[in-house]
Amino acid sequence: MAAWRPPRVEELLAEARRAFMEEFGAEPELAVSAPGRVNLIGEHTDYNQGLVLPMALELVTVMVGSPRTDGLVSLLTTSKDADEPQRLQFPLPSAQWSLEPGIPQWANYVKGVIQHYPASPLVGFSAVVVSSVPLGGGLSSSASLEVATYTFIQQLCPDSGAIAARAQVCQRAEHSFAGVPCGIMDQLIALLGQKGYALLIDCRSLETSLVPLSDPKLAVLITNSNVRHSLGSSEYPVRRRQCEEVAQALGKESLREVRMEELEAGRELMSKEGFRRARHVVSEIRRTAQAAAAMSRGDYKAFGRLMVESHYSLRDDYEVSCPELDQLVEAALSVPGVYGSRMTGGGFGGCTVTLLEASVAPLVIDHIQEQYSGTATFYLSQAADGAQVLSL
């Protein structure tokens, strides 16, 4: 089986323009895109003020549209996986009236960004959303839509905020309109991604540094398990709370401030489960710093070893893996030429990410498909650019 080739931005843009013309009877005036992402290492560390190392993908959300004069927002998505209805209309928020989350869920990400957008006056608009980022696959379709929405509104009502402030608006939208207490990684990489680079993000200071990832002999393979265990949505807030409780027990603001020796010394202050959760986070922050350094010096073997350690820690200490993800990782690791593999994203399903020699990619894909009990989807990606304004 070959890796899936996602549609290029130009193809998505053409689809969006056609849909806009059909729905609204005119050509759109504006177009933007924002990418999904894969996190190479640094899982469940962002909401602990830790380090993460994502890269933007060539999978993107495209938004096209035009301003309106009646104070309404009219939306349509072409995504088959989005919940119904695929179109809706609502008035802009005002001093007297705030937007509220509702049905369909996909539109809540758009509503949240509109509600929290920092500049004024807001202008109504009609827009069509088209995306190649799979929903629920752990590749951040939500942040992709939030950042596309923010970038679109910027064209109608320019803001003066720094990029970190824009990411925080999108993060707040997800907290308050989707009910997900996410960290800030997904929004930052969607804004700041650069072709040929991963991005090391310090989620405490919001400082970022580019890590070269453009060796043509190297490939990043994303494997979607195509399973989504319902545990994911309920367990995410539990993990976050457990981390906060351990930090509090140790008198720290977050687990970022905790060294492994301090955690070991304070074992009696927390539950066995809390200790394991914190051990994952503290060790994962250290692994992420080491991995960024390894990638910068071209030491792919060291990077791969750290990926594998990360997976085992997520499986055993953080307990967010599942049999399907474990199967995919073990299958990948059994092929020569694979440097490392791990689950990526929140867990309980979704995707794995594998670093490998580009030449063995077809072999790895065939082997995983043979070994995997389910039906996986494969996607080979280069590190891509962040949000863009597209010309029409």
From Swiss-Prot:
GO terms for biological process: galactitol metabolic process; galactose catabolic process via UDP-galactose, Leloir pathway; galactose metabolic process; glycolytic process from galactose. The keyword Ubl conjugation does not apply. Keywords: ATP-binding, Carbohydrate metabolism, Galactose metabolism, Kinase, Nucleotide-binding, Phosphoprotein, Transferase. The modification Phosphoserine is found at S230. The active site is at D186 (proton acceptor). ATP binds at G136, G138, S140, S141. It is an enzyme of class 2 (transferase). Pathway: Carbohydrate metabolism; galactose metabolism. The record marks R37 as: Transition state stabilizer. It catalyses: alpha-D-galactose + ATP = alpha-D-galactose 1-phosphate + ADP + H(+). Belongs to the GHMP kinase family. GalK subfamily. NCBIfam families: gal_kin. This is Galactokinase. It comes from Mus musculus. The gene is Galk1.
